[in-house]
Amino acid sequence: MNLSCVTIQAGLQRPVRLLHLSDTHLCFADNRDCQRKRDLAASRIRYFSGSNETLESYLDEAVAFARQHDCLIVHTGDLIDFVSHLNLEKLHERFALADTFFAVGNHEYSLFVGEAKEDNAYKMQSFHHVQDAAPNPIECASRQVGGLNLVAFDNGYYRFSTAHLDFLKAELQRGLPTILLMHTPIHTENLARHMRDVRKEPCAYLCGSPSHWLDTYSEQRREQQTPDQPTLDFIDFATHQPLVRAVLAGHLHFQFADLITPTLPQFVAGAGFHNQATLVNVI
């Protein structure tokens, strides 16, 4: 396992260890699925290590590490690459093997990957199937461990909702230091520049990007990633709360650490399909 380590200051009486995973992209399909889906599985796995067995061995390694080092696994989405009978079964089975808290990604809802506009109507075609397989509520959820509050949101389509904001406000009433989990990272200038200048990406694939970035995107990507008012309201509130100590995200397939505000770090996990993981020591 390619392991990196970060420390988050939260003022806990005892340290809490999290093993942060993201973007595994399992690509299973079987005879219960149509031929198109089976062909998709064979095609997509080539991008993600070339073998589902290899991906599962990476997950086995992470579970063994978490058990050995008393870690709660936190996974920030895209455990599976698309919806299939076997992928959903694998999602359920994998999260049952170790104590896990989950923030859903956009690929958990993908029917054929890129074949349609990803919006709420598209998501709802598979939402209940994904929810049935997941270890916790996927729209928003919380988990308290060792005096720390973990709060997860579904922002896989680059949006937050008023319901997300209401949920966060209620969770902060607990008065506990809080870490936010989400699939899509919140925009920072450093991360956006890295995506453009180092990764040579045509857009930043971030949540809450401002207009001076969006104006350079293609029409499709600009529409996809332009934040609506509930998204802006959520980010403004969440990033200015003293109890919110860090953001954990995924989506980009490489590790990146930056500050959203002078006091709020964001840690983007590397790709699970590259056997990357982050040990998060919360103290």
Model region roles, listed by residue range:
Residues F48-L55, L59-D60, A103-V113, T188, ...:
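A short, conserved beta-to-alpha structural element at the edge of catalytic cores
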Residues M1-L86:
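N-terminal active-site segment of His-dependent metallophosphoesterases
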Residues V6-A10, S84-I179, P202-L206, A257-N281:
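Extended active-site neighborhood of metal-dependent phosphoesterases/phosphodiesterases
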Residues L26, I80-D81, E108, N149, ...:
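Short active-site segment of divalent metal-dependent hydrolases/proteases
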Residues L18-H20, H75, F102-A103, L180, ...:
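Residue-level marker for buried hydrophobic side chains located in beta-strands
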Residues D23, G77-D78, G105-N106, H183, ...:
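Active-site glycine-centered loops adjacent to acidic/histidine catalytic or metal-binding residues
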Residues L12-R38, Y109, L181-Y205:
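Short, solvent-exposed beta-strand-terminating loops
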